[in-house]
UniProtKB/Swiss-Prot annotation:
Source organism phylogeny: Eukaryota, Metazoa, Chordata, Craniata, Vertebrata
Reaction(s) catalysed (UniProt annotation): (S)-lactate(out) + 2 Na(+)(out) = (S)-lactate(in) + 2 Na(+)(in); propanoate(out) + 2 Na(+)(out) = propanoate(in) + 2 Na(+)(in); pyruvate(out) + 2 Na(+)(out) = pyruvate(in) + 2 Na(+)(in); acetate(out) + 2 Na(+)(out) = acetate(in) + 2 Na(+)(in)
Protein name: Sodium-coupled monocarboxylate transporter 1
Chief subcellular location: membrane
Protein family membership: Belongs to the sodium:solute symporter (SSF) (TC 2.A.21) family.
Transmembrane segments: 16-36, 52-72, 87-107, 129-149, 162-182, 185-205, 240-260, 284-304, 337-357, 390-410, 416-436, 439-459, 520-540
Domain of life: Eukaryota
Species per Swiss-Prot/TrEMBL record: Xenopus tropicalis (Western clawed frog)
Length: 620
């Protein structure tokens, strides 16, 4: 039975574990600042010299977006809404296949540093600038959320000053990211994934022991309606269903893994294309492992608190504080383990923030500085990259203040990626899949998708969906012992949300329809609008007349399974030709270099003749 004030507090050993995690992360950054001669060029700093291998990159990919938002938000999601969130296991598999077979081949073939370099090659400088600005806005906002999340956990379980913890998070992360570049980020991610799994495991194992085995946990979850894996309701207004998670989640996470600089920068830093693809598929195993840990933690939390919900009882002020509360409650007799869990949440944030800062520095240097200051030496560009990392670290710390105003961390984080990531995904899809889409169509499509997704996203924040669409599960106070309270809390209740939802009379008609769209469909909506509008605008503005460089498009050879399937069916002399999907080869086309593993060239340094031919994606 849970009673107020009955949880433990941080001990010396907890602080030791926590400090050790920070120290090791910082040491890794210092090591890679000097290892191998240090970060002599911007390519060394931003891309690790394009010499990374699959396993560390895979773990880094897993850690980058399995942040404190996952550590704190997903168990609370399962506790309140049930285990339907586990359907994301299917979504992750679909996303990895799309990313590795559609987007990775094109980006790797071009040997680019910033994904937005592709937009200039395929379209023009203005499209590249638009994509870069949207990415910077998206990433700074998201990073603010994931900095705030562990600070909230620390504040809840240790009494640390909330904003002091926010600053500490940003400073430590910015330090090792600035010192060691991409290699430091990747290898600290490897270490931090281990900490995340260890932290989750300590909570799960102890919960199983406390509850007498995994059986009682599953039994409590079943009778509490938490094992609600399947709900095929097609209603797009319902917060989570099979379709919102699989369809909406696929668009949201493809925007992250397929075209987001933070992820793409890692796998195109691999030394071969095979290693790059392998890193994505190994990363899938990591995603499944972290998801399983988070879901099991949520079910264990419900089993322990099924008769006395700490949130409704006001032992915690927000659902995202439930996991740190649980860790102190059940691990208080084991010095060091509460510190391990807080380190788990903190590790998730350090990995995500460092990835974001490194990506922000990359797009700023490659897209906003290098094209206009080409006379700068590589040494100077390396120092500029480090300075840019410092600046973005400070900006992200400042933006963490907004996170305190955005409600649930998990939904807020995915909503941001939906509102901005969806239109960006549509933009890259227009360039890679549709050879007739021109620059005008790309701009109109991007802005249309962004306007629509921003409209519904902001509307949903102002007028949150009602409980009828979010479908929270009942929580109980029957087992609480409120000896200091006059009221007798002995009934099953739903947490009150009236302070978050305006009165029905003040809600416009769109509030219960358009603004109540599942947050996972924000990305789907933005992508579809961007693609449809972009295609129509291009057709109306003469897009069919252009002849696009085939290196910028998806080809049949880019599908690895097609290469194996048809390898024995090619006629002699055809091996060097490239068949572009949905594209008729013209007599003026010539065979283009298909790129090699570990591309070392920089297209911005190509000869002026080649540059004119490839600029805007049109062959002169």
């Amino acid at each position: 039975m849970v009673t107020p004030g009955n949880i433990g507090s941080f001990t010396v050993w907890d602080y030791v574990v926590f400090a050790l995690m920070l120290l090791i992360s910082a040491v890794i950054g210092i090591y890679y600042a000097f290892a191998g001669g240090g970060q002599k060029t911007s390519k060394d700093f931003l891309m690790g010299g394009r010499s990374m291998t699959a396993v560390p990159v895979a773990l880094s990919l897993t850690a980058s977006f399995m942040s404190a938002v996952t550590v704190l938000g997903t168990p609370a999601e399962v506790y309140r809404f049930g285990s339907m969130f586990s359907i994301f296991a299917f979504t992750y598999a679909i996303v990895v296949v799309i990313s590795s077979e559609v987007f990775l081949p094109v980006f790797y073939r071009l040997g680019i540093t910033s994904t937005y370099e592709y937009l200039e090659l395929r379209f023009n400088k203005f499209v590249r600038l638009l994509g870069t600005i949207l990415f910077i806005i998206q990433t700074v906002l998201y990073t603010g959320i994931v900095i705030y999340a562990p600070a909230l956990a620390l504040n809840q379980v240790t009494g640390f000053d909330l904003w002091g913890a926010v600053v500490a998070t940003g400073v430590v992360c910015t330090f090792y990211c600035t010192m060691g570049g991409l290699k430091a980020v990747v290898w600290t991610d490897v270490f931090q994934v281990g900490i995340m799994v260890a932290g989750f495991s300590s909570v799960i194992i102890r919960a199983v022991v406390v509850q007498g085995g995994i059986g009682p946990i599953l039994n409590d979850s079943y009778y509490g309606d938490r094992l609600n894996f399947w709900d095929f309701t097609p209603n797009p207004l319902q917060r989570h269903s099979f379709w919102t998670i699989v369809v909406g989640g696929t668009f949201t996470w493809t925007g992250i893994y397929g075209v987001n600089q933070s992820q793409v920068q890692r796998y195109i830093a691999c030394k071969t294309r095979f290693q790059a693809k392998l890193s994505l598929y190994i990363n899938l195993l990591g995603l499944w492992a972290i998801l399983a840990c988070a879901v099991l933690s949520g079910l264990a939390m419900y089993s322990i608190y099924k008769d006395c919900d700490p949130w409704t009882a006001q032992f915690v002020s927000a659902p995202d504080q439930l996991m740190p509360y649980l860790s102190l409650d059940i691990l208080r007799d084991y010095p060091g383990l509460p510190g391990l869990f807080v380190s788990c949440a903190y590790s998730g944030t350090l990995s995500t923030v460092s990835s974001s800062i490194n990506a922000l520095a990359a797009v700023t240097v490659e897209d906003l500085i290098k094209p206009y200051f080409r006379s700068l030496s590589e040494t100077k560009m390396s120092w500029i990259s480090k300075g840019t990392s410092l600046i973005y670290g400070a900006i992200c710390i400042a933006m963490a203040g907004l996170a305190s105003l955005m409600g649930g961390l998990l939904q807020a984080a995915l909503s941001i990626f939906g509102m901005v990531g969806g239109p960006l995904l549509g933009l890259f899809a227009l360039g890679i899949i549709f050879p007739f889409v021109n620059s005008l169509g790309a701009v109109i499509g991007l802005l249309s998708g962004f306007a629509i997704s921003l409209w519904v996203g902001i509307g949903s924040q102002i007028y949150p969906p009602t409980a009828s669409s979010s479908l929270p599960k009942p929580l109980s106070l029957e087992g609480c012992n409120f000896t200091s309270f006059e009221s007798n809390w002995t009934t099953t209740v739903m947490p009150m949300m009236t302070t978050l939802i305006p009165e029905v009379s003040s809600r416009p008609e769109l509030a219960d329809s358009w603004y109540s769209l599942s947050y996972l469909y924000f990305s789907t909506l933005g992508t579809i609008v961007a693609v449809v509008v972009g295609v129509i605008a291009s057709l109306l503005s003469g897009g069919l007349k252009q002849n696009v460089n085939r290196d910028f498009l998806l080809t049949s050879q880019d599908f690895s399974y097609l290469n194996v399937l048809f390898s024995n069916c090619k006629k002699k002399g055809q091996e060097e030709k490239v068949e572009v999907l949905n594209w008729k080869m013209r007599s003026t086309d010539t065979d283009m270099d298909q790129g090699t593993d570990n591309p070392a060239f920089n297209h911005m340094e190509m000869s002026s003749t080649e540059k004119k031919e490839k600029m805007n994606g049109i062959i002169a």
